Swiss-Prot record:
Superkingdom to which the source organism belongs: Bacteria
Amino-acid positions noted as binding S-adenosyl-L-methionine in the UniProt annotation, renumbered to this chain: A92, S98, R107, Q111, Y204, E208
Main location as per UniProt: secreted
Catalytic reaction equation(s): L-cysteinyl-[protein] + S-adenosyl-L-methionine = S-methyl-L-cysteinyl-[protein] + S-adenosyl-L-homocysteine + H(+)
Name this polypeptide is given: Cysteine S-methyltransferase NleE
Length: 224
């Protein structure tokens, strides 16, 4: 069962050169063992040191880049609208598109992945007003972390973020129950069960959700 950490009110920026401090600032309940490990190949883009616990932030790659990204995000930021309209799935098909549609007020919740907890976009996002993140490691992957970004100034924000995590866990449970099936068949069957509601909480257009469900159905019929 996934139990993500949440920064409920956003976080305040901290002035530090130490890599450990910035991660704990956005992910306070991360296991201590994480900092005893050597930086992975993706971490090394942003930090330098023998272990994450003694590593320092790289000035250009993390500090300056985070400042640039935060400045960009502030120009794109909008207060929460009274009502949200459906968006095209294509608008949120990239990590930037996913969080940009949230901070610009187009939808209350989105999801993307990062390959390092030192990703400057992640840290910049967490400092925006009324923008919150739930972070948890992707299962069976040594690098990826899933980030659920949502509007804290909309009741739909955390509600949909929590429902995403519930659906994510449902899909994982189904995959485990179907462990005797081929990997592709497990993936498609579990997707069939959660896909429509997942599309709805991501605010995708109803027609696009219908098209995706038809695609999944066709894919299932070809596999079975």
């Amino acid at each position: 069962m996934i139990n993500p950490v949440t920064n409920t009110q956003g976080v305040s920026p901290i002035n530090t050169k130490y890599a450990e401090h910035v991660v704990k600032n956005i992910y306070p309940e991360i296991k201590h063992d994480y900092f005893n490990e050597s930086p992975n190949i993706y971490d090394k883009k942003y930090i330098s040191g023998i272990t994450r616990g003694v590593a320092e932030l790289k000035q250009e790659e993390f500090v300056n880049e985070k400042a640039r990204r935060f400045s960009y995000m502030k120009t794109m930021y909008s207060v929460c609208p009274e009502a949200f309209e459906p968006i095209s799935r294509n608008e949120a098909s990239t990590p930037e598109g996913s969080w940009l549609t949230v901070i610009s007020g187009k939808r209350p919740m989105g999801q993307f992945s990062v390959d390092s907890l030192y990703n400057p976009d992640l840290h910049a996002l967490c400092e925006l007003p009324d923008i919150c993140c739930k972070i948890f490691p992707k299962e069976n992957n040594d690098f990826l972390y899933i980030v659920v970004v949502y509007r804290n100034d909309s009741p739909l924000g955390e509600q949909r973020a929590n429902r995403f995590i519930e659906l994510y866990n449902i899909k994982r449970d189904i995959m485990q129950e179907l462990n005797y099936e081929l990997p592709e068949l497990k993936a498609v069957k579990s997707e069939m069960i959660i896909a429509r509601e997942m599309g709805e909480i991501f605010s995708y257009m109803p027609g696009e959700i219908d098209s995706y469900m038809k695609y999944i159905n066709n894919k299932l019929s070809k596999i079975e």
